[in-house]
């Protein structure tokens, strides 16, 4: 029999509200609407299907404060992660939202009405408190960056009436709701289920540790990977799911099933581990594996871990009785070549030879085409990963040139385009500052906001082209550090490679060699908001290459860029 849900009752709002579907659908058309973001959609789906039981909506201020401060809802139920609906003042004003009013929650992807929320309260969160208490306070933490840079200024709390499930077009048969997974376990006759959470591909070590956990508890295995939002830079879920499917036959017959979880991870370490355990309990699991640095985001810029390696295990152990799911703590397993087996590291006798491949080394082997041994991963899994991780010399990249007007950016860009075309092997696209302004951003001015929007557009185009294997050369002024960092993030998150080249030609030289007289017009006040005259240029703090046309020729600068690309493996050396 499956584990009882958290709070005692599975809050399957879709099943509960199905008899009123037509009535709610008609009402939703007449109400103001909040169009949900991707993260909000992930949260809503798990509220509606019971994955976040005992929640029945987005948290009001009482629950939010209690979760942040006490790791439990206002009614006393253990819950570790704030589940909130953030909105802007403009949305509140447009919808005339207030406590007691009803509002439709709508999918941004297809404009479908998903639910109606009855507003309990609208409140301004204490983001500093949330950042400190929930995530630890390090401003480099991805969830804290998201909180400060993406989350709107107000939260809307209230209960939900469900109308429609989210539409998915990928791996539909594997997207079990908690109720469906519980029925599936009953059909299979499974009474004890060990759930395994992952956002990465699985290899032999993962297979070994899950089988060990199941055998020790006379249980079966639920492979339950996250396919919602994970950490930027993670391998896409399409590739991962194909790899999980390829791995499944390697388990003893009938031992494991694969189900997908559309969760938006926060990378919240100890808090997230508790949350993950609650979610798996709601899906019917009786046991949950928590490993080293569970759901941690890695290291900050100083090379420091955001959380201790076993903080997550300590957190779930602290609340073990309340969680109502047995937590399986595991040590990292390692390969013993002399006996061709895997063992937990704490069980390996001193002096015995072991082998491991780190995630960084694996990515490097995929990038370079170096062999990946069978003791580490199965050939069918490696084949899938290689298909989605082509060698570096076939990948696209973006060269992002930034500097003052007339610093030589465009001359470098044109010369680099010719050189790369001569090199061959990939298409080359040129995004000159003036061309982009004319073709993509003609309606924009030169305010800080408009400049940022212009760079966002360049980054979007560059990311799409780079992902498709093209070489992109962009040469906007891009005076602001925030915009340049956002451009780097956009391209890398699209799966591309990004190089920032600071064309650090001094302002005096740019002005002296300005044959068009644009600087002179700016000095006379005929042009406002001109970079270097009455608007600042923020020197890049993390340029991949710094060049100067007042001291170097364009030819030598292009050669430096080519050498940088060659060193990084972007040209075929065979």
Swiss-Prot record:
It is found in: Cytoplasm. Its EC number is 2.7.7.4. Pathway: Sulfur metabolism; hydrogen sulfide biosynthesis; sulfite from sulfate: step 1/3. Residues 170-394 are annotated as: Catalytic. The keyword Transmembrane helix does not apply. It comes from the Eukaryota. Sulfate binds at residues 197, 199, 295. Its main location: cytoplasm. GO terms for biological process: cysteine biosynthetic process; hydrogen sulfide biosynthetic process; methionine biosynthetic process; sulfate assimilation, phosphoadenylyl sulfate reduction by phosphoadenylyl-sulfate reductase (thioredoxin). Residues 395-574 are annotated as: Allosteric regulation domain. ATP binds at residues 197-200, 291-294, 333. The record marks 330 as: Induces change in substrate recognition on ATP binding. This is Sulfate adenylyltransferase.
């Amino acid at each position: 029999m499956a584990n009882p849900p958290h709070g005692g009752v599975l809050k399957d709002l879709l099943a509960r509200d199905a008899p009123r579907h037509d009535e709610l659908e008609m009402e939703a058309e007449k109400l103001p609407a909040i169009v949900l973001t991707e993260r909000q959609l992930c949260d809503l789906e798990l509220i509606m299907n019971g994955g976040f039981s005992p929640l029945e909506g987005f948290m009001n201020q009482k629950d939010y404060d209690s979760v942040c401060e006490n790791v439990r809802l206002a009614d006393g139920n253990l819950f570790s992660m704030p589940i909130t609906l953030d909105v802007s003042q403009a949305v509140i004003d447009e919808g005339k939202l207030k406590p007691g009013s009803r509002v439709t929650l709508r999918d941004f992807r297809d404009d479908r009405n998903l639910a109606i929320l009855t507003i309990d309260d609208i409140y301004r969160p204490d983001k500093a408190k949330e950042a400190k208490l929930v995530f630890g306070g390090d401003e480099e933490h991805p969830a804290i960056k998201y909180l400060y840079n993406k989350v709107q200024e107000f939260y809307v709390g209230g209960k939900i009436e469900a109308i429609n499930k989210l539409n998915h077009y990928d791996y539909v048969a594997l997207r079990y709701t908690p109720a469906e997974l519980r029925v599936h376990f009953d059909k299979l006759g499974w009474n004890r289920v060990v759930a395994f959470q992952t956002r990465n591909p699985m290899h032999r070590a993962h297979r070994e540790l899950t089988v060990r956990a199941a055998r020790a508890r006379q249980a079966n295995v639920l492979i339950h990977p996250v396919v919602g939002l994970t950490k930027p830079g993670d391998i896409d879920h399409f590739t991962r799911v194909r790899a999980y499917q390829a791995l499944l036959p390697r388990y003893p017959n009938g031992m494991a099933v694969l189900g997908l979880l559309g969760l938006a991870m926060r990378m919240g370490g100890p808090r997230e581990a508790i949350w993950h355990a609650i979610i798996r309990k709601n899906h019917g699991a009786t046991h949950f594996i928590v490993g080293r640095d569970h759901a941690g985001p890695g290291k900050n810029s100083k090379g420091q871990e955001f959380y201790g390696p076993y903080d997550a295990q300590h957190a779930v152990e602290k609340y073990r009785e309340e969680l109502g799911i047995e937590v399986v703590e595991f040590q990292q397993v390692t390969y013993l070549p002399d006996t061709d087996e895997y063992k937990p590291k704490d069980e390996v006798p001193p002096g015995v030879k072991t082998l491991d491949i780190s995630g960084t080394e694996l990515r490097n082997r995929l990038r370079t085409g170096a062999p990946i041994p069978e003791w580490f991963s199965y050939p069918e899994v490696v084949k899938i990963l290689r298909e989605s991780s082509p060698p570096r010399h076939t990948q696209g990249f973006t060269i992002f040139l930034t500097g003052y007007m007339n610093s030589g950016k465009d001359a470098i860009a044109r010369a680099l385009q010719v050189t790369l075309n001569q090199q061959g092997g990939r298409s080359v696209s040129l995004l000159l500052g003036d061309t982009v302004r004319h073709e993509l951003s003609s309606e924009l001015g030169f305010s800080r906001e408009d400049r940022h929007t212009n760079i966002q557009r360049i980054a979007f185009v560059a990311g799409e082209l780079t992902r498709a294997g093209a070489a992109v050369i962009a040469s906007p002024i891009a005076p602001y550090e925030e915009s340049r960092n956002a451009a780097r993030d956009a391209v890398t998150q699209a799966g591309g490679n990004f190089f920032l080249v600071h064309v650090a030609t001094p302002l005096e030289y740019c002005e002296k060699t300005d044959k068009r007289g644009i600087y002179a017009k700016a000095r006379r006040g005929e042009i406002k908001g001109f970079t270097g005259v009455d608007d600042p240029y923020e020197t890049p703090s993390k340029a991949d290459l710094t060049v100067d046309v007042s001291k170097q020729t364009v030819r030598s600068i292009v050669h430096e860029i080519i050498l940088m690309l060659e060193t990084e493996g972007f040209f075929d050396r065979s």
